[in-house]
Amino acid sequence: MKTPLTEAVATADSQGRFLSSTELQVAFGRFRQASASLDAAKALSSKANSLAQGAVNAVYQKFPYTTQMQGKNFASDQRGKDKCARDIGYYIRIVTYCLVAGGTGPLDDYLIGGLAEINRTFDLSPSWYVEALKYIKANHGLSGDPAVEANSYIDYAINALS
């Protein structure tokens, strides 16, 4: 998994050198940010179910046809609604992984890489997940540095879906 720190180490190693003072300063900066990131990950994890359910409702309000159309990829029955909440929960989980890892690696490796294919295969609209992520960003209850950290990964996911 790529993070700014692992990339700096890999570059220095491939060049047969130690980390430069600038690279070390970046690493120390990352460690200072780590506390805010871990606070954000902890908060998102503890609120994951309520955030996912709120995001599901936001999607249904903006796209009411998702609860009216029949089919396995829509939320016309409880099974479909459960799948929607599960999928939104995956996004929350991956964002928390990014917060812990300190980089977009988890989003890049586990979600974005195959996202277009998954959405196409299962006839899922990225706009549903954009709406869900916007809800999560607006309602996670974080402030200060933890909010900045969480929002950066949420925005990254939104941009990847857009």
From Swiss-Prot:
Signal peptide: none
UniProt KW keywords: Antenna complex, Bile pigment, Chromophore, Electron transport, Membrane, Photosynthesis, Phycobilisome, Thylakoid, Transport
Binding residues for (2R,3E)-phycocyanobilin: C84
Swiss-Prot/TrEMBL induction comment: Phycocyanin-2 is expressed in red but not in green light (inducible phycocyanin).
Classification via InterPro entries: Globin-like_sf, Phycobilisome_asu/bsu, Phycobilisome_asu/bsu_sf, Phycocyanin_a
Compartments (UniProt record): Cellular thylakoid membrane
One cellular component (GO) term of this entry: plasma membrane-derived thylakoid membrane
Short name of any one Pfam family annotated for the protein: Phycobilisome
Gene3D superfamilies: Phycocyanins
PTM summary: Contains one covalently linked bilin chromophore.
A GO biological process held by the record: photosynthesis
Membrane topology: Peripheral membrane protein
Subunit structure: Heterodimer of an alpha and a beta subunit, which further assembles into trimers and the trimers into hexamers.
Protein role: Light-harvesting photosynthetic bile pigment-protein from the phycobiliprotein complex (phycobilisome, PBS). Phycocyanin is the major phycobiliprotein in the PBS rod.
UniProt record similarity statement: Belongs to the phycobiliprotein family.
Protein name, entry field: C-phycocyanin-2 alpha subunit
Organism: Microchaete diplosiphon (Fremyella diplosiphon)
Gene from which the chain derives: cpcA2
